[in-house]
Amino acid sequence: LASRVAWREPMSGIARWLDGQVRKLGVDLRLNTQATEASVLAEKPDEVIIATGGVPNRGRFAESDLVHTSWDILEGRIMPAEGQSVLVYDDSGDHQGVSCAEYVATRGASVEVATPDKHVAFRLGPTNRPIHVRNLHKAGAVMTPDVRMSGVSREGNRVVVVLKNDYTGAEEERVVDYVVVEHGTLPREDLY
C-alpha cells in the first residue's frame, strides 16, 4: 500500500527484497492464506512465526457503511471518479491518510483532508511531509486542521460529514460523494 502514490513506488522494493532473502534461506512461506489454529497444528511445524498483520481501524465509525478506509482506496476496492468529492479524515497524521488523499486527488477527485492535528501529515518528518503537502496543493486539495469528525449521515446519494473545531466547538458540514477515515491499524488477534 505504501507504494501506491507514485513518488513512493520504490517502497515496493523492500517487500520484494525481504521475500527474496527469506526464500534464499529455504523458509516455507504461506502468504495470503487464511490460518486457523487447526490448520497450523495440522502442519506439525517445528517453529511457527505468525505475522497476522492488521486491519484498518474505522474508529467510532466502525459500524457505519458510509465511511471507507484508506486501505479501500489504496487497495483499489473503491475509486472515486474524476470530479467526485472526497473528504479524507486523517486521525493518524502518518503516510496512510495523505497518501490516500494524494492518490485520489491526482486522479481528478476533489479532495479535502481534515485532521484534528495542527497541520496535515503531523507525524511525518521534514523529508516526507513537504512532498505530500506540495502534491496535495498541486492537485487542488483543501487541508483543514483542528477539526474532528463528529457525525456522518446519508443525504440522497451523498454523505453529510460534521466537522467540529477542537478550539471553538463550532461545527461545519460537508456534503461529499465519499468519506474516507484513517485511524491507524488494529492488530488481528483472532489466532492468539
Where in this protein do the model-derived segments appear?
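A Rossmann-like FAD-binding core segment of flavoenzymes
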Residues: 12-57, 66, 71-75, 82, ...
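Hydrophobic transmembrane alpha-helical segments of multi-pass transport and channel proteins
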Residues: 76-77, 95
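Short amphipathic alpha-helical segments
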Residues: 1, 60-63, 100-102, 191-192
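Short glycine-enriched, charge-decorated loop/helix-capping segments at active-site entrances
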Residues: 2-8
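Short beta->alpha junction loops/turns
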Residues: 4, 93, 184-185
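Rossmann-like NAD(P)H-binding beta-loop-alpha module
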Residues: 82-111
